[in-house]
C-alpha cells in the first residue's frame, strides 16, 4: 500500500469525528442516501466508513472513484463540489452526488465526505422512511 499523505493522530481523529455525522445524515435521508467517508492516506482503499453502501456496493476499503480523484485538484480551493450525477459500474442506479473536502488544522485536504442519493427510489419510499 502506498501512502498518499503522511497522517498525524490529529488527522485520524478529525476523520473519525465524521462517523456520527455520516450516521446522522443517513438517519435523516434514509437507505437511499449512501455516505462514504474517504481518507486520503491510502488511495487504493480510501473508504474508511460507509453507510448504506448497498446503493453502489461500496464497502470499507473501496478505492476513491475516478470523479473523486479528479476533484482533488479543485478541492484545494473549494470545500464542496458542485452536485453531479453518477452511475455505478453496472449502470444502475442513477445517483446525484456531492463531495465535501475534510481539512486538518493546517487546511490540508485529508479526506472526502461523499453523499450519493439514489434517484431510482420512488419519492413515496423516500418520504415514508
Locations of regions flagged by a protein language model:
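Juxtadomain coupling helices with adjacent low-complexity linkers
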Residues: 2-28, 111-112, 117-129
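Sensory/regulatory domains in signal-transduction proteins
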Residues: 63, 67-125
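Structured interaction and signal-relay segments at domain junctions
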Residues: 22-84, 88-90
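Short linear functional motifs in flexible/disordered or boundary regions
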Residues: 37, 47, 109-110, 127
Amino acid at each position: 500500500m502506498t501512502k498518499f499523505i503522511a497522517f498525524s493522530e490529529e488527522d485520524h481523529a478529525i476523520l473519525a469525528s465524521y462517523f456520527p455525522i455520516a450516521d446522522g445524515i443517513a438517519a435523516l435521508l434514509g437507505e437511499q442516501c449512501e455516505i462514504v467517508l474517504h481518507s486520503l492516506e491510502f488511495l487504493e482503499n480510501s473508504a474508511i466508513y460507509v453507510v448504506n453502501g448497498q446503493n453502489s456496493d461500496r464497502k470499507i476499503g473501496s478505492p476513491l472513484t475516478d470523479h473523486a480523484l479528479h476533484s482533488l485538484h479543485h478541492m484545494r480551493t473549494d470545500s464542496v463540489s458542485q452536485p453531479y450525477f453518477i452511475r455505478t459500474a453496472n449502470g444502475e442506479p442513477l445517483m446525484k452526488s456531492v463531495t465535501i473536502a475534510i481539512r486538518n488544522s493546517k487546511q490540508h485536504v485529508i479526506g472526502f465526505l461523499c453523499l450519493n442519493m439514489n434517484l431510482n427510489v420512488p419519492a413515496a419510499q423516500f418520504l415514508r422512511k
